[in-house]
Amino acid sequence: MSKRIVVISDTQIPFDDRKQLKAVIGYIGDTQPDEVVHIGDLMDYPSPSRWTKGTKEEFAQRIKPDSEQCKRRFLEPLRQVYDGPVGVHEGNHDRRPVDYLHQFAPALVEYVSSFQFQNLLDFDGFGVDVLPEFYKIAPGWISTHGHRGGVRVTQKSADTAYNAMMRFGTSVIIGHTHRQGIKPHTLGYGGNQKVLWSMEVGNLMNMKLAQYLKGATANWQSGFALLTVDGQHVKPELVPIVGGRFSVDGRVWEV
């Protein structure tokens, strides 16, 4: 039998698009995939960001409240409808509290576990795993958030994942860019071929809440991704959210 994996990315709670996130959780509950992977930047954690250093936001004391929002809007609703395996990559935003501690309070680093996102969000209590930086998500495929491994980030959809694919020599699925795109590349000689695939998942963030855009519209696409696995066969598929709807296998979900 085939296996289906749902991959979501860059919710950046509390700046998530709440309607989109709720609809995707509803889809997961309706279809019961074999695995759910959040590919990183589950959280935003703006207070310890380098961009807010020295501003009022740095003193907002919102790490705990934001973590509670994640529990209420993502982890609790997800576990109410789905009891299968859930794994989360640590994105660059997810580790902002830890990075802040290392940089500005090194005397307290022995307490670093208290600032790790898996503990702030009680992953153990929700039965959620922290995935390795490079996760063998399917035969011939790895998933990673996309901010590490020497990957060159570009502004065109799928090109960052393509750079990762060529660097790693395997099919790759990433988040980080907030863009959606799929791009293959064929290698071989003498008519023999090996096709590698690269995919960027998109995001479930509310762009209007991204203050660092300063009112601009970024080249981001809302949606998520699917991997359908049957033995060594892996089909990558993007699910864009457009006009308040998305569709999978001929069925439409409203946002």
UniProtKB/Swiss-Prot annotation:
Pfam families: Metallophos
Residue ranges that the Swiss-Prot or TrEMBL entry lists as coiled coil: none
Entry-linked Gene3D superfamilies: 3.60.21.10
Gene Ontology molecular-function annotations: hydrolase activity
Record protein name field: Gene 54 protein
Lineage, broadest ranks: Viruses, Duplodnaviria, Heunggongvirae, Uroviricota, Caudoviricetes
Naturally occurring in which organism (per UniProt): Mycobacterium phage L5
Entries under InterPro entries matching the protein: Calcineurin-like_PHP_ApaH (IPR004843), Metallo-depent_PP-like (IPR029052)
Cysteine-cysteine disulfides: none
